[in-house]
């Protein structure tokens, strides 16, 4: 759906507390959403699909790797006159017209 890094996950405090009590796994406690997502029968989810103009699930816009930083820096340089206030649609359009930029972080493994 949305590019990786442009999506959100929202949980109630009660859900987080319940998940915490149910698991002893250090990994689940560090990455609190893992336990919740592994148990959809206990924690049902509502998934919102990105509109067609923003749909690009394989695009990585997270900052997990030096290559991610390089790509994000280029995006911010492009939009610097907008004072860091530019919509995702503009980023997507920019990347679609500058496909060479997509090669910067296309091999980064996502979690």
Provide a role label for each language-model segment.
Residues 1-59, 67, 74, 90-111:
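Conserved core of the sugar-phosphate nucleotidyltransferase
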Residues 4, 62-63, 80-81:
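A short, ordered amphipathic alpha-helix with a cationic face
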Residues 26, 80-86:
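Cytochrome P450 catalytic domain signature, combining two hallmark sequence patches
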């Amino acid at each position: 759906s949305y590019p990786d890094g442009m999506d959100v996950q929202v949980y109630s405090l009660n859900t987080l507390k319940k998940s915490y009590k149910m698991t002893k796994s250090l990994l689940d406690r560090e990455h609190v959403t893992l336990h919740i997502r592994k148990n959809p029968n206990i924690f049902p989810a509502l998934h919102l699909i990105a509109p067609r103009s923003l749909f690009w699930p394989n695009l990585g816009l997270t900052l997990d790797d030096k290559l991610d930083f390089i790509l994000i820096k280029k995006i911010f340089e492009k939009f610097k006159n907008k004072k860091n206030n530019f919509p995702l649609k503009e980023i997507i359009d920019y990347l679609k017209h500058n496909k060479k930029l997509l090669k910067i972080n296309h091999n980064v493994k996502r979690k």
